[in-house]
Amino acid sequence: MSLHSDESNWQTFKRLWTYIRLYKAGLVVSTIALVINAAADTYMISLLKPLLDEGFGNAESNFLRILPFMILGLMFVRGLSGFASSYCLSWVSGNVVMQMRRRLFNHFMHMPVRFFDQESTGGLLSRITYDSEQVAGATSRALVSIVREGASIIGLLTLMFWNSWQLSLVLIVVAPVVAFAISFVSKRFRKISRNMQTAMGHVTSSAEQMLKGHKVVLSYGGQEVERKRFDKVSNSMRQQTMKLVSAQSIADPVIQMIASLALFAVLFLASVDSIRAELTPGTFTVVFSAMFGLMRPLKALTSVTSEFQRGMAACQTLFGLMDLETERDNGKYEAERVNGEVDVKDVTFTYQGKEKPALSHVSFSIPQGKTVALVGRSGSGKSTIANLFTRFYDVDSGSICLDGHDVRDYKLTNLRRHFALVSQNVHLFNDTIANNIAYAAEGEYTREQIEQAARQAHAMEFIENMPQGLDTVIGENGTSLSGGQRQRVAIARALLRDAPVLILDEATSALDTESERAIQAALDELQKNKTVLVIAHRLSTIEQADEILVVDEGEIIERGRHADLLAQDGAYAQLHRIQFGE
């Protein structure tokens, strides 16, 4: 999926401006300060004319006496304006980057699951960190240079034409050449900047995979594989950086050479008798110094072009992400609490990019308060059915109804409030156990309710032995807990939510036999007044289900109660024999 926008720099900057203008007070102050800074530099050069024409040649002139104080005052103004401009623009850029990161983060949270199926976590992290930091460069350092150097160029040009328009006319020829050179390198910088973003995404992704899979790397001796992988993407990033440096290193001397030709032309014209007769030493010195002074802002503008283009390329990528469609939430129906009756009617679903349907014409019902179990081989489509219940994906055809209303008619937040999910892939947050159990509902539950849920899930057995009990911080994804402990915290979270419909996707898969029996007792008690969809690998956990559905290659091939399915001696009976070694 391409995340780059096809917008021009101007269109991109207009979109970026919607963020910048929110902090226009700081922008106005910094712009005024930059103009004052540039004016101070220009005025100092202009002092050369009276110094040469009047100061040294006129013994009675007071100019030499006041000149040191003028220079001191100008330097003070220059320093103060420099501080004000840098501070204010840094304040503006910091806020702009913060707002863009917030919006991007919020956008990610509302993206459909299929988006994360296709994008690497490391690449997306790079967008939030590296790309947004490039925007800071465009909105602070680049803008500082553009405004300050732009004001300097305007001031110096004005000074030159004011003192000698004849000598200054040479710039009319030089200016288009400089503009063409800057435009050419800008396009090159922009292309390289996009490649750098992609390369940085690969670096982040490679590092993230190694860090998350560190135990696998150690277990299988994969250090050399990961080292080579990371070396490759790191070298790619280095190559792109060197391309940028090369382009910038070539651009700077080219601009300097063009400016040198302009100086050559000025010196040549000054030797012409008709022009020389009208020049005073002070006038010539001011014009020559101003033209020489143009080299610094021209070089700075060329250098900052690369930074500005990196910022614009990053903006295009970020805006491209923000333009991606979020989860469709067109439903209008809301229910305070549903009864929990679920009807799956002729559902067919195919994952994006796949040709074969994951589910084909699946139909079944779960009456209120009943339990239906899904069994079958891995990849048969069991978890897909659960994902369709909560609209992590939408069906291709058919419908899934909750209390007689199509799940697509519900508002997403309202729909998902009626489901509690315990997955085989437990995710916990770097927070306290209590906050993980009451996730996204802090303040809605009392401490006693949280503790009761933990006891029902048999989690208090290990929580009470932890340093701060329920207030113990468990690390990223619960790294300080065992697999079974993490599973019990997730079950406690589902118990506390008290949703009408429970989805247990291999909910006890990480538990030992003793813990599983204890948890199963708690789940049995919980399921009395709930509609439950159980996805099970261990057949012993679903023997009491009201109906068992055997799923194979996206189709339901058998259905019935445990004893009936065993009597049929079909696929379920075969699974049972394999699992129990019969």
Curated annotation (Swiss-Prot):
GO-annotated biological processes: transmembrane transport
Residue intervals of the ABC transmembrane type-1 domain: 28-310
GO molecular-function term, one example from the UniProt record: ATP hydrolysis activity
Recorded topology in the membrane: Multi-pass membrane protein
Enzyme class name: translocase
Entry EC no(s): 7.5.2.6
CC per GO annotation: plasma membrane
Keywords: ATP-binding, Cell inner membrane, Cell membrane, Lipid transport, Membrane, Nucleotide-binding, Translocase, Transmembrane, Transmembrane helix, Transport
Positions contributing to ATP binding: 376-383
Reactions this protein catalyses: ATP + H2O + lipid A-core oligosaccharideSide 1 = ADP + phosphate + lipid A-core oligosaccharideSide 2
Cross-referenced PROSITE patterns: ABC_TM1F, ABC_TRANSPORTER_1, ABC_TRANSPORTER_2, MSBA
Stretches that traverse the bilayer: 27-48, 63-85, 144-168, 170-188, 244-266, 283-302
Assembly description: Homodimer.
PANTHER family: ATP-BINDING CASSETTE SUB-FAMILY B MEMBER 10, MITOCHONDRIAL, ATP-DEPENDENT PERMEASE MDL1, MITOCHONDRIAL
Function: Involved in lipopolysaccharide (LPS) biosynthesis. Translocates lipid A-core from the inner to the outer leaflet of the inner membrane. Transmembrane domains (TMD) form a pore in the inner membrane and the ATP-binding domain (NBD) is responsible for energy generation. Shows ATPase activity.
Domain notes: In MsbA the ATP-binding domain (NBD) and the transmembrane domain (TMD) are fused.
Family as reported in the entry's similarity comment: Belongs to the ABC transporter superfamily. Lipid exporter (TC 3.A.1.106) family.
Name of the protein: ATP-dependent lipid A-core flippase
Organism: Vibrio cholerae serotype O1 (strain ATCC 39315 / El Tor Inaba N16961)
